[in-house]
């Protein structure tokens, strides 16, 4: 009887299965890294927006003159967020010495993640003695969720 060399079908299936597992693991890690990058970018963007608003309107008694297009143009930043939605600015109607940064167009998962993030220097974060995130949101299914963070005095 002759002995043949080569790979058997079982060996090839085993190798392909291992490759599939490695590929799936790599995809999961890449996806997690991309989500972390987006979340970090939102944090950086909000910090830049808040700094810009305070720099542009800080000399006034309140933020009633806030205007989305003027602010985003002045700080040379797009109002688009990495999740496909927008950043929006508005004066807090109950306290004109405060303004609200809203992040819209979010999925439920992203909304929940941003809602629990510590928004340092936000009114809610400071008032709670750093025990609450400072963000408010009602996160539901779909991609129309909004996270709002209040800044100011």
Q: Which functions belong to the PLM regions below?
A:
Residues 1-34:
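N-terminal single-pass transmembrane signal-anchor helix
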Residues 10, 41-44:
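Sequence-pattern detector for short linear motifs
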Residues 13-21, 39-40, 78-83:
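Short, functional N-terminal and low-complexity linear motifs
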Residues 30-36, 43-64:
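N-terminal alpha-helical signal peptides/signal-anchor transmembrane segments
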Residues 38-41, 106:
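Extracytoplasmic/periplasmic, Sec-exported soluble proteins
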Residues 55-153:
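Periplasmic/extracellular, small/polar-rich flexible segments of pilin-like filament-forming proteins
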């Amino acid at each position: 009887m002759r002995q043949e060399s080569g790979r058997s079908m079982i060996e090839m299936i085993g190798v392909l299965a291992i490759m599939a597992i490695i590929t799936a693991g790599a995809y999961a890690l890449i996806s997690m890294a991309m989500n972390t990058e987006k979340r970090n970018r939102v944090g950086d963007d909000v910090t830049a927006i808040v700094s810009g608003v305070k720099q542009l309107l800080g000399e006034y008694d309140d933020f009633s003159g806030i205007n989305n297009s003027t602010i985003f143009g002045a700080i040379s930043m797009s109002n688009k967020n990495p999740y496909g939605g927008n950043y929006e600015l508005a004066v807090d109607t109950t306290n004109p010495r405060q303004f609200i940064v809203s992040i819209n167009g979010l999925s439920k998962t992203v909304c929940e993640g941003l809602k629990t993030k510590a928004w340092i220097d936000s009114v809610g974060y400071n008032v709670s003695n750093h025990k609450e995130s400072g963000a408010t949101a009602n996160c539901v299914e779909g991609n129309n969720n909004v996270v709002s963070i209040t800044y100011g005095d």
